Amino acid sequence: VPKHLVVIGGGVIGLELGSVYLRLGSQVTVVEFMDKIISGMDGALSKELQKVLRKQGMKFELSTAVSAVERNGDSVKVTAKNKKGEEVNFEGDYVLVSVGRRPYTDGLGLEKAGVELDERGRVKTNDHLQTNVSNIYAIGDVIKGAMLAHKAEEEGTLVAEILAGQKPHINYNLIPGVVYTWPEVAGVGKTEEQLKEEGVAYKVGNFPMRALGRSRASGDTDG
């Protein structure tokens, strides 16, 4: 267990693993390029999770761009620039890099098959998950969208139903996402920020966990 772990990336993986080491006794510093953590989720959830994790002892450096990582003996030095353009440094025993994932398509022979990829290396598909090669379909982590097992499973079912002559449909807004920190964070549907951007009328409702009997009984009232 490292004494000090520097996490580059305040997304799902970085926070999940960072919070594990935090509970194991490490000092954890999260360095994030965006101005909030879990940027793909609702802003209210992001603020609440950051507040809870900060209370647990996790440190956050937001709007900070990492430019270099160097091994220095038994420690690792991270060089970055903050939102003021000033150079800042962080030193820890280990660095966890979690700045996103890319589709793993190496060795699939897509070039030989003539299957087209987009600018991010993902397989291009239409609404039926069909590639530009009519008899080849793609699902899961190699196409656009969240890299989630239950999303891939739903897409596999859709393709099977299409091949069986049916006309299925996936509503991606109904696919939930979960961050397994403590406490956990979950979301489904459009975020408040997305609704604002799209000009959709909406109402906001909040219910504090501390008002829930089970939460009070278990002593877990954050959220």
What are the language-model segments listed below?
Residues 1-36, 40-41, 148:
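Rossmann-like NAD(P)H-binding beta-loop-alpha module
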Residues 15-16, 21, 105-107, 119, ...:
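Glycine/Thr-rich phosphate-binding loops of Rossmann-like dinucleotide-binding domains
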Residues 42-44, 55, 66-68, 104, ...:
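Mid-to-C-terminal Rossmann-like scaffold of FAD/NAD(P)H-dependent oxidoreductases
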Residues 24-127, 190, 197, 201-203, ...:
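A Rossmann-like FAD-binding core segment of flavoenzymes
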Residues 8, 15, 39-40, 118-120, ...:
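Thr-Gly-centered strand-to-loop micro-motif
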Residues 1-3, 89-163, 169:
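FAD-site-proximal beta/loop scaffold in flavoenzymes
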